[in-house]
Design a protein with these regions (language model features):
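Positively charged n-region of N-terminal signal peptides that target proteins for export
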Residues: 1-4
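Aromatic-acidic/polar surface patches that form glycan- and anion
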Residues: 6, 34
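Bacterial N-terminal signal peptides
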Residues: 9-20
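Boundary at the C-terminal end of the N-terminal hydrophobic targeting segment
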Residues: 23-32
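Residue-level detector of functional hotspots within protein domains
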Residues: 31, 37-39, 87-89
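N-terminal targeting signals for Sec/Tat export/insertion, comprising classic cleavable signal peptides
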Residues: 36-60
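Compact alpha-helical subdomains of small soluble proteins
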Residues: 52, 56-128
Length: 128
């Protein structure tokens, strides 16, 4: 009898969790159109050949910066609803030190990643 009660409660909990999971997941992630913009921004970072990315005093190649941004986006998925959220909450500054991420181009120019990504967002929004 006790085992039956435990199993009943267990399966009721699973059923309840399964019922709320889809709505929870959809409420947590960005809409498809915004995800498309974020993916386009990340692609722009990856396409910056010969550029260097600076984060907390360390230098990274574009491919490494892309992997980092994807991981940080995934970790902060619940907070990122728009491409602008991605720029502001993920791709602009270190959550640890607060220091801005920087991009140094081949010609030596340096820009904050936030400025670069906002400019890129203005270019891609009309296309998407």
């Amino acid at each position: 009898m006790k085992r039956r009660l435990v199993l009943t409660v267990f399966f009721a909990c699973i059923a309840m969790f399964a019922a709320i999971l889809p709505s929870f997941a959809s409420a947590q992630s960005a809409p498809a159109a915004e995800k498309q913009k974020i993916e386009a921004l990340i692609k722009q970072v990856g396409d910056l050949k010969h550029a260097k990315f600076f984060r907390n005093g360390w230098t990274y190649e574009p491919a490494t910066a892309v992997r980092f941004l994807r991981g940080k986006w995934e970790a902060n998925d619940a907070e990122v609803k728009t491409a602008r959220d991605f720029i502001d909450k993920v791709a602009s500054a270190s959550g640890t030190s607060g220091k801005p991420y920087l991009i140094r181009f081949k010609d030596g120019r340096e820009i904050k990643s936030q400025e670069f990504l906002l400019a890129e967002l203005k270019k891609i929004e009309p296309k998407l």
